[in-house]
Amino acid sequence: MIQQESRLKVADNTGAKEILCIRVLGGSSRRYAGIGDIIVATVKDAIPGGNVKRGDVVKAVVVRTVKERRRPDGSYIKFDENAAVIIKPDNDPRGTRIFGPVGRELREKRFMKLISLAPEVL
């Protein structure tokens, strides 16, 4: 469960290392984001010479959450960290690589380019 002020690791090679959630998209009073949801965030930590700089406002899709999520078959999925991938306005990833596994929920939400770059889909 990601909400305002949540900090997430960045799981791509855009140059950002950590982002802070400013807003959860998808409704005026939407409070939480899960795997596959889009958030607006600001870059809190970045490496020098990266595509994004500290202070940039970006859109990102959540790919891993610590809070467990129930799937339609009754199983649960949870990860060791909260992580997101920075995306362009057309919902394609901004980086060219993705690090670590991503949730299967991304396929249901039609993030196919992101799925193809991911090393593992759980």
Swiss-Prot record:
Taxonomic superkingdom: Bacteria
Q: Does the keyword Iron apply?
A: no
Q: Which UniProt keywords apply?
A: Ribonucleoprotein, Ribosomal protein, RNA-binding, rRNA-binding
**GO biological process, any:** translation
Q: Which PANTHER family match?
A: 50S/60S RIBOSOMAL PROTEIN L14/L23 (PTHR11761), LARGE RIBOSOMAL SUBUNIT PROTEIN UL14M (PTHR11761:SF3)
Q: Which family does the record assign? A: Belongs to the universal ribosomal protein uL14 family.
**Assembly and interaction partners:** Part of the 50S ribosomal subunit. Forms a cluster with proteins L3 and L19. In the 70S ribosome, L14 and L19 interact and together make contacts with the 16S rRNA in bridges B5 and B8.
What is the name attached to this protein's record? Large ribosomal subunit protein uL14
UniProt organism field: Mycobacterium ulcerans (strain Agy99)
